[in-house]
Amino acid sequence: MVSAVYPGTFDPMTRGHEDLVRRASNIFDELVVGVAHSPNKRPFFSLEERISIAREVLGHYPNVRVEGFSGLLKDFVRKNNARVIVRGLRAVSDFEYEFQMAGMNRYLLPDVETMFLTPSDQYQFISGTFVREIAVLGGDVSKFVFPSVERWLQEKIAKPE
């Protein structure tokens, strides 16, 4: 059985993220979506909210599990006995950062491979940052996120903490 980890902040989970999960879940026996705590990124949604959102969006995939984590990715990968780290590449601008991360992960986890997936064409430009900015400014994000995620965004914007 080959398990993979797809780590990210998922702030919020977008249709682009789900596209990668769908495709990766067809490749691996088990896919663990690791929702990173990422306090340095100052996420819009709390870790618990991001986990709940991801579970709502991805709950229908029988071989996909969503878990939160903090600390080093290498520890999360080991905990889940994963052999592959899945990463998305939207554009050339993502490549340099992801290439460096893959190199560091190879150093820390020599027996774990990093696999890059590019999103389907209609999702190439979507990012959680863009989605949040559009939503906060009152724009329509329905083409970028699922209805449940749009509701989460609207509720969070209406009741900021």
UniProtKB/Swiss-Prot annotation:
Keyword list, A-Z: ATP-binding, Coenzyme A biosynthesis, Cytoplasm, Magnesium, Nucleotide-binding, Nucleotidyltransferase, Transferase
Pfam families in the record: CTP_transf_like (PF01467)
Compartmental location: Cytoplasm
Residues that coordinate or bind substrate: T9, K41, L73, R87
EC assignment: 2.7.7.3
Pathway named in the protein's UniProt entry: Cofactor biosynthesis; coenzyme A biosynthesis; CoA from (R)-pantothenate: step 4/5
Binding positions (ATP): T9, F10, H17, G88, L89, R90, E98, Y123, Q124, F125, I126, S127, G128, T129
Cofactor: Mg(2+)
Top-level taxon: Bacteria
Site description Transition state stabilizer, residues in chain: H17
Molecular function (Gene Ontology), one example: pantetheine-phosphate adenylyltransferase activity
GO BP terms: coenzyme A biosynthetic process
Principal subcellular localisation of the protein: cytoplasm
Catalytic activity: (R)-4'-phosphopantetheine + ATP + H(+) = 3'-dephospho-CoA + diphosphate
GO cellular component term, pick one: cytoplasm
Biological role: Reversibly transfers an adenylyl group from ATP to 4'-phosphopantetheine, yielding dephospho-CoA (dPCoA) and pyrophosphate.
HAMAP family membership: PPAT_bact
Self-association and partners: Homohexamer.
Family: Belongs to the bacterial CoaD family.
Name of the protein this chain belongs to: Phosphopantetheine adenylyltransferase
Organism: Cupriavidus taiwanensis (strain DSM 17343 / BCRC 17206 / CCUG 44338 / CIP 107171 / LMG 19424 / R1)
Underlying gene: coaD
